[in-house]
Amino acid sequence: MLKEFKEFAIRGNVIDLAIGIIIGGAFGKIVDSLVKDVIMPPVGMIMGKMDFASLFLNLSGTEYATLAEAKKAGAATLNYGIFISTIVDFLIMAFVVFLMVKQINRMKKEAPAPVAASDSKDCPFCLSPIPLQATRCPHCTSNLK
Protein backbone atom coordinates (compact mmCIF):
# COMPACT_ATOMS: atom_id res chain seq x y z
CA MET A 1 0.00 0.00 0.00
CA LEU A 2 2.88 2.36 0.78
CA LYS A 3 4.41 1.55 -2.61
CA GLU A 4 1.14 2.40 -4.38
CA PHE A 5 0.92 5.70 -2.52
CA LYS A 6 4.51 6.54 -3.46
CA GLU A 7 3.76 5.83 -7.14
CA PHE A 8 0.62 7.98 -6.92
CA ALA A 9 2.41 10.88 -5.21
CA ILE A 10 5.37 10.88 -7.58
CA ARG A 11 3.19 10.77 -10.67
CA GLY A 12 3.55 14.03 -12.62
CA ASN A 13 -0.05 15.16 -12.24
CA VAL A 14 0.03 15.19 -8.44
CA ILE A 15 3.26 17.17 -8.32
CA ASP A 16 1.95 19.61 -10.95
CA LEU A 17 -1.22 20.07 -8.89
CA ALA A 18 0.77 20.73 -5.70
CA ILE A 19 2.95 23.31 -7.45
CA GLY A 20 -0.15 24.94 -8.93
CA ILE A 21 -1.80 25.20 -5.52
CA ILE A 22 1.31 26.75 -3.95
CA ILE A 23 1.74 29.27 -6.76
CA GLY A 24 -2.00 29.99 -6.76
CA GLY A 25 -1.95 30.75 -3.04
CA ALA A 26 0.98 33.11 -3.44
CA PHE A 27 -0.67 34.77 -6.44
CA GLY A 28 -3.88 35.18 -4.42
CA LYS A 29 -1.93 37.09 -1.76
CA ILE A 30 -0.45 39.35 -4.44
CA VAL A 31 -3.87 40.12 -5.90
CA ASP A 32 -5.31 40.68 -2.42
CA SER A 33 -2.57 43.21 -1.67
CA LEU A 34 -3.08 44.84 -5.08
CA VAL A 35 -6.76 45.35 -4.36
CA LYS A 36 -6.42 46.47 -0.73
CA ASP A 37 -3.24 48.54 -1.02
CA VAL A 38 -3.20 49.86 -4.59
CA ILE A 39 -6.66 49.85 -6.21
CA MET A 40 -9.10 50.57 -3.38
CA PRO A 41 -7.30 53.55 -1.75
CA PRO A 42 -7.49 55.73 -4.91
CA VAL A 43 -11.08 54.60 -5.52
CA GLY A 44 -11.92 55.52 -1.93
CA MET A 45 -10.19 58.88 -2.32
CA ILE A 46 -12.15 59.64 -5.47
CA MET A 47 -15.35 58.79 -3.61
CA GLY A 48 -14.62 61.23 -0.78
CA LYS A 49 -11.78 59.73 1.27
CA MET A 50 -13.73 56.56 1.91
CA ASP A 51 -12.05 53.41 3.26
CA PHE A 52 -13.97 50.50 1.74
CA ALA A 53 -12.78 48.06 4.39
CA SER A 54 -14.51 50.13 7.09
CA LEU A 55 -17.93 50.29 5.39
CA PHE A 56 -20.53 48.37 7.37
CA LEU A 57 -24.15 48.34 8.43
CA ASN A 58 -24.78 47.93 12.13
CA LEU A 59 -27.54 45.36 12.66
CA SER A 60 -27.79 46.00 16.41
CA GLY A 61 -29.42 49.09 17.87
CA THR A 62 -26.18 50.52 19.31
CA GLU A 63 -24.13 53.13 17.41
CA TYR A 64 -20.47 52.42 16.62
CA ALA A 65 -18.07 54.82 14.91
CA THR A 66 -15.93 52.14 13.30
CA LEU A 67 -16.16 48.52 12.28
CA ALA A 68 -13.40 47.68 14.75
CA GLU A 69 -15.47 49.09 17.63
CA ALA A 70 -18.53 47.13 16.53
CA LYS A 71 -16.52 43.89 16.26
CA LYS A 72 -14.91 44.50 19.66
CA ALA A 73 -18.37 44.95 21.22
CA GLY A 74 -19.60 41.79 19.48
CA ALA A 75 -22.29 43.62 17.51
CA ALA A 76 -23.84 42.01 14.46
CA THR A 77 -22.65 43.86 11.36
CA LEU A 78 -23.06 43.58 7.62
CA ASN A 79 -19.55 44.27 6.27
CA TYR A 80 -20.34 45.31 2.71
CA GLY A 81 -17.06 47.23 2.27
CA ILE A 82 -15.00 44.10 2.78
CA PHE A 83 -17.39 42.29 0.44
CA ILE A 84 -16.84 44.93 -2.29
CA SER A 85 -13.07 44.50 -1.92
CA THR A 86 -13.46 40.73 -2.17
CA ILE A 87 -15.53 41.07 -5.35
CA VAL A 88 -12.84 43.28 -6.93
CA ASP A 89 -10.26 40.74 -5.79
CA PHE A 90 -12.22 37.92 -7.45
CA LEU A 91 -12.73 39.83 -10.70
CA ILE A 92 -9.01 40.51 -11.02
CA MET A 93 -8.16 36.87 -10.28
CA ALA A 94 -10.76 35.60 -12.75
CA PHE A 95 -9.49 37.96 -15.47
CA VAL A 96 -5.86 36.92 -14.93
CA VAL A 97 -6.81 33.22 -15.01
CA PHE A 98 -8.80 33.87 -18.21
CA LEU A 99 -5.74 35.52 -19.81
CA MET A 100 -3.49 32.65 -18.72
CA VAL A 101 -5.84 29.98 -20.10
CA LYS A 102 -6.22 31.94 -23.32
CA GLN A 103 -2.43 32.10 -23.77
CA ILE A 104 -1.97 28.42 -22.93
CA ASN A 105 -4.66 27.44 -25.43
CA ARG A 106 -3.01 29.63 -28.06
CA MET A 107 0.34 27.92 -27.48
CA LYS A 108 -1.29 24.47 -27.49
CA LYS A 109 -2.85 24.82 -30.94
CA GLU A 110 -1.79 21.78 -32.84
CA ALA A 111 0.37 22.17 -35.89
CA PRO A 112 -1.32 21.04 -39.07
CA ALA A 113 -0.90 17.33 -39.65
CA PRO A 114 1.82 16.53 -42.17
CA VAL A 115 0.49 15.58 -45.56
CA ALA A 116 0.64 11.83 -45.95
CA ALA A 117 2.58 10.42 -48.87
CA SER A 118 0.21 10.11 -51.76
CA ASP A 119 -0.53 6.68 -53.19
CA SER A 120 -1.51 8.18 -56.53
CA LYS A 121 -0.12 10.40 -59.26
CA ASP A 122 -1.65 12.37 -62.10
CA CYS A 123 -1.70 11.02 -65.63
CA PRO A 124 0.59 13.25 -67.74
CA PHE A 125 -1.89 13.11 -70.62
CA CYS A 126 -5.37 13.56 -69.09
CA LEU A 127 -4.32 14.72 -65.58
CA SER A 128 -6.64 12.21 -63.87
CA PRO A 129 -5.45 10.63 -60.62
CA ILE A 130 -4.06 7.12 -61.13
CA PRO A 131 -2.24 4.61 -58.86
CA LEU A 132 1.54 5.00 -58.62
CA GLN A 133 2.04 1.46 -59.96
CA ALA A 134 -0.12 2.01 -63.07
CA THR A 135 1.46 1.44 -66.48
CA ARG A 136 -1.61 2.53 -68.43
CA CYS A 137 -4.14 5.26 -67.57
CA PRO A 138 -7.62 3.77 -66.96
CA HIS A 139 -9.23 7.04 -68.08
CA CYS A 140 -7.51 7.88 -71.35
CA THR A 141 -5.76 4.50 -71.89
CA SER A 142 -2.42 6.21 -72.54
CA ASN A 143 0.70 4.11 -72.07
CA LEU A 144 2.62 5.56 -69.09
CA LYS A 145 5.99 3.82 -69.56
UniProtKB/Swiss-Prot annotation:
Annotated GO MF terms: mechanosensitive monoatomic ion channel activity
Main location (coarse class): membrane
GO cellular component, one term: plasma membrane
PROSITE patterns, per database record: MSCL (PS01327)
Top-rank taxon: Bacteria
Pfam family, one: MscL
Subcellular location: Cell inner membrane
Stretches of the chain forming a coiled coil according to its record: none
Keyword Zinc: no
Membrane topology of this protein: Multi-pass membrane protein
Record key words, sorted: Cell inner membrane, Cell membrane, Ion channel, Ion transport, Membrane, Transmembrane, Transmembrane helix, Transport
Transmembrane segments: 14-34, 81-101
Family that this chain belongs to: Belongs to the MscL family.
HAMAP family documented for this protein: MscL
Functional note: Channel that opens in response to stretch forces in the membrane lipid bilayer. May participate in the regulation of osmotic pressure changes within the cell.
Alphabetical list of PANTHER family matching this protein: LARGE-CONDUCTANCE MECHANOSENSITIVE CHANNEL, MECHANOSENSITIVE CHANNEL MSCL
Subunit structure comment from the entry: Homopentamer.
Protein name: Large-conductance mechanosensitive channel
